[in-house]
Swiss-Prot record:
<keyword id="KW-0456">Lyase</keyword>
<keyword id="KW-0368">Histidine biosynthesis</keyword>
<dbReference type="Pfam" id="PF00475">
    <property type="entry name" value="IGPD"/>
</dbReference>
<keyword id="KW-0028">Amino-acid biosynthesis</keyword>
<comment type="pathway">
    <text>Amino-acid biosynthesis; L-histidine biosynthesis; L-histidine from 5-phospho-alpha-D-ribose 1-diphosphate: step 6/9.</text>
</comment>
<dbReference type="GO" id="GO:0000105">
    <property type="term" value="P:L-histidine biosynthetic process"/>
</dbReference>
<keyword id="KW-0963">Cytoplasm</keyword>
<dbReference type="InterPro" id="IPR000807">
    <property type="entry name" value="ImidazoleglycerolP_deHydtase"/>
</dbReference>
<dbReference type="GO" id="GO:0004424">
    <property type="term" value="F:imidazoleglycerol-phosphate dehydratase activity"/>
</dbReference>
<comment type="similarity">
    <text>Belongs to the imidazoleglycerol-phosphate dehydratase family.</text>
</comment>
<dbReference type="InterPro" id="IPR020568">
    <property type="entry name" value="Ribosomal_Su5_D2-typ_SF"/>
</dbReference>
<dbReference type="InterPro" id="IPR020565">
    <property type="entry name" value="ImidazoleglycerP_deHydtase_CS"/>
</dbReference>
<protein>
    <recommendedName>
        <fullName>Imidazoleglycerol-phosphate dehydratase</fullName>
        <ecNumber>4.2.1.19</ecNumber>
    </recommendedName>
</protein>
<dbReference type="InterPro" id="IPR038494">
    <property type="entry name" value="IGPD_sf"/>
</dbReference>
<dbReference type="GO" id="GO:0005737">
    <property type="term" value="C:cytoplasm"/>
</dbReference>
């Protein structure tokens, strides 16, 4: 099984994560940010990843440091757990509707860090979660995992629905891209490296 454990401690945050890519969607999330916990739970459940995240951050300042640093830790955990990436499918695109919202997420487990994010969010907050931190999380995750990630809102207006569809689609897309293809041999690249 492809598993990882990552710890990261700074003056702003103290984060621990356990990941099993080949899990069943079990999760135990405690970041101190209720809405973010909910999104990470959806991500794990729909990606079928077993995920534990325990984060303590300077929430008296705001949620930015905690959300971004969880993205860093999870990106590192996925990178570590993915191992040599032999025989993975590598690419995936997933669409997820949430009522009026429709979000498309495309991933390439490429070894090249890039984020394209087009998620216009009308609300500044959902609960105590600053919505601008969605992009901060996605950037930290993509850059620390070393993936190309495109996230686009095709239509919708409710910020909660848009963010929820995003995390579900990200989980589904990663599940597909990281799946082992029994027909494939070696690294899925003509370069021989990802």
């Amino acid at each position: 099984m492809r598993k990882a454990e990552v710890k990261r401690k700074t003056k702003e945050t103290d984060i621990y994560a356990e990941l099993n890519i080949d899990g069943k969607g079990n999760y135990d999330i405690a970041t101190g940010i209720g809405f973010f916990d909910h999104m990470l739970s959806l991500f794990a459940k729909h990606g079928l990843f077993d995920l534990k995240v325990v984060a303590k951050g300077d929430l008296e300042v705001d949620t930015h440091h905690t959300v971004e640093d969880v993205g860093i830790v999870l990106g590192n955990a996925f990178l570590k757990a993915a191992g040599d990436k032999k025989s993975i499918k590598r690419f995936s695109t997933f669409y997820v509707p949430m009522d009026e919202a429709l979000v498309r997420v495309s991933v390439d487990i490429s070894g090249r860090s890039f984020l394209y994010c087009d998620l216009p969010l009308k609300a500044e907050r959902v609960g105590n979660f600053e919505t601008e931190n969605v992009e901060e999380f996605l950037r930290a995750f993509a850059y620390n995992f070393g993936i190309t990630l495109h996230v686009e809102l095709l239509h919708g207006g409710n910020s909660h629905h848009i963010i929820e569809a995003t995390f579900k689609a990200l989980g589904r897309a990663l599940d597909e891209a990281l799946r082992i293809d029994e027909r494939a041999e070696g690294i899925p690249s003509t370069k021989g490296i990802l």
